[in-house]
Amino acid sequence: TLSTKTSGYIGFDCTSDSLHVGSLLPLMILKHFQSFGHTPIVLLGGGTTLIGDPSGKDETRKILSAEKINSNKKKLKKVFEKFLSFDSSKENAALLVDNYDWLSNLNLINFLRDIGSKFSVNKMLSLESIKQRLKREQNLSFLEFNYSILQAFDFFELFKKYNCKIQFGGSDQWGNIVSGIDLIKKIKNTEQIFGLTSPLITTSNGKKMGKTADGAIWLSKDKC
């Protein structure tokens, strides 16, 4: 259990210039988290969006240009400001960070040696998003296969920089969240790391509501 105030985060990809109603529950979790005196961290996936999360996807995501991703990030910030307080005068002001800031500067050899060595390919193949692609014999790129490692590294970086001890996310992110918890425990030898997932808001046919899927209900009025 948490005995002191801490920080927790949720990651959002930048595949669109707005969020949809499927992101409403995660946003409300961060809002309540802040209302109890903790510090919410919004992680923009400026780096990982260049790769694409395979979770809940039947096919490889379309790769966006860096220019489009940067444009989306600016507009997404306005959505977050409707739910969270970024007032720097408050002790637990929300933080907005971008994983491009650390992922873009990684040295491949050092990363494979220091971080990649902590991951088991056997375990990665058991992740539901990976397992389903392979079962259906659908294409899974090397980029997507490594997504869970990068998300785990995000958690590790936030733990180091902001003492972030909790990652929130949708139920489809459980495997990725656990990967981050395991990485931190292996490197920092601590047990005070947590993951919390929430149910997904789905479409009428039971599919995950996503920004790139048909029928998305947007949180920005200019997208409605």
Explain the meaning of each model-derived region:
Residues 46-49, 152-155, 203:
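Short connector loops/turns at beta-strand edges and beta->alpha or beta->beta junctions
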Residues 52-56, 106-112, 207-213:
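Short acidic, glycine/serine/threonine-rich loops at helix termini
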Residues 2-54, 167-174:
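N-terminal catalytic cores of NTP/NDP-binding nucleotidyl/phosphoryl-transfer enzymes
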